[in-house]
């Protein structure tokens, strides 16, 4: 029997689900292969979505027609907007999610997406013919043929879990690892290595003394990750709880370090710098007497809690003893211990910006296989890989995002141009155009691109136009409406603001950092009437978007001009068959890096570590500039 598809997606994690859903929505016949259909989009670590820079990625995924934002909104049990005390370029949405409902919501999407089919199995190897992928062969011996394959294998390629001295093969607790794909691709010349990540114990909430913790509730107004107006039932909101380790806890952990895989030589791989294990914390920060932890609820009604900040691969008995040294956890019962896991990843400089591999045509990688960490980073890559897998099948060009267009663009460019030597996670500091990549306007930046390829439906387009019309109407009004001191000063003085000495435009008044649009509405009835025309469910979002554009107009224009200047280098393409090793005028390091990465444009070459401005000038001469 022959089974033929346009796109095969291997793995149904966050990257795989976005890839499969996007390709299917665009019209490809898609097969999603997973060893467990009951664990689609499993939240393998903490039950949360978003956070600093990650929340922006989720909004970008939604603006492009992806599903992570919609699923998060439907399953959120707490919402917070982080960094509100800073400028809007730093605002980052974050939500606690009901883990089980999150998987159920994704399963519902996958099952009801036309053109998307599932197969429960694992993949043994790829079918590759004449340098191009042709399908996969599963552990059951079934061969599926396809014009493109997207690998989103997470931590399952060669996965080995560490529970103290005990080592168990697996990609997740109680789930087997995959073998065969890494070995096959290595034989084809792919560069591969190992990385490590970890997860903490899960705790029974009935054994926690919450009176000895600090409650952290969410925000009362129910924000959304999605720009869509999809109806939803708001789940019962749950709090998180803060607590701290102490010297007694640290002493117990220290005595067990000789049994820690991280310190006895058992683990050789590099773990995530910004999510260190508790063992790493007490060694690296030996002078600190306490480290903050957070108890995060796993669901709307669940007693299970995730202990954020206590990732560990120490033996169970040491983990348990150390936890019981914390007053709130004196009588703790755990559902399962923390553990570390090592897995295979592939050097992402072997990818193009479409996430297609350079050595094998039609083969795409997304997620942890590229050396990243995080649900959001994986989902963003999956979406781009799924779009491009579809376009590749139908000879319809390619879809990429620039560093000035999306955090997803920054993420992929960093991977492709710089590579990774540790698990990569996104931060706002990685983006040079943060003011252009705000979470409030991802729809303005990206939904037109989704419309152009057919990924945005008509309702999404309607909502974008509505937002644009009302936002521009508000801004236009502020440019035209003049304020007289005798009318506005009583309001300003009663609110503690400096009075006006002469008449000014409303726009100029709003440039004052301490004065907001909502406050001005109470002073200017005609502005209030425009605000009241906006649908109530979107009023706060649209007013906020207009206010940000007014207050940060100068900064936005300056950053846009800088981005446009750099983008001119993006249009200068490098010849792909030049022998850089023969270009003696380039530095030795530049020759090596350019040969290995083979950048597509001058701009990409300029971002490669080791390629100097002098090297870039030589490349410009090569391109006839």
From Swiss-Prot:
GO BP of this protein: tRNA methylation; tRNA wobble uridine modification
Subcellular location, record wording: Cytoplasm
Pfam family, one: SAM_GIDA_C
Keywords: Cytoplasm, FAD, Flavoprotein, NAD, tRNA processing
Domain of life: Bacteria
Database matches in InterPro entries: FAD/NAD-bd_sf, GIDA_C_N, MnmG, MnmG-rel, MnmG-rel_CS, MnmG_C, MnmG_C_subdom, MnmG_C_subdom_sf
Purpose of the protein: NAD-binding protein involved in the addition of a carboxymethylaminomethyl (cmnm) group at the wobble position (U34) of certain tRNAs, forming tRNA-cmnm(5)s(2)U34.
Required cofactor names: FAD
Record bears the keyword Transit peptide: no
Family: Belongs to the MnmG family.
Record has tRNA processing as a keyword: yes
Subunit structure: Homodimer. Heterotetramer of two MnmE and two MnmG subunits.
GO CC annotation: cytosol
Main localisation: cytoplasm
Protein name (database record): tRNA uridine 5-carboxymethylaminomethyl modification enzyme MnmG
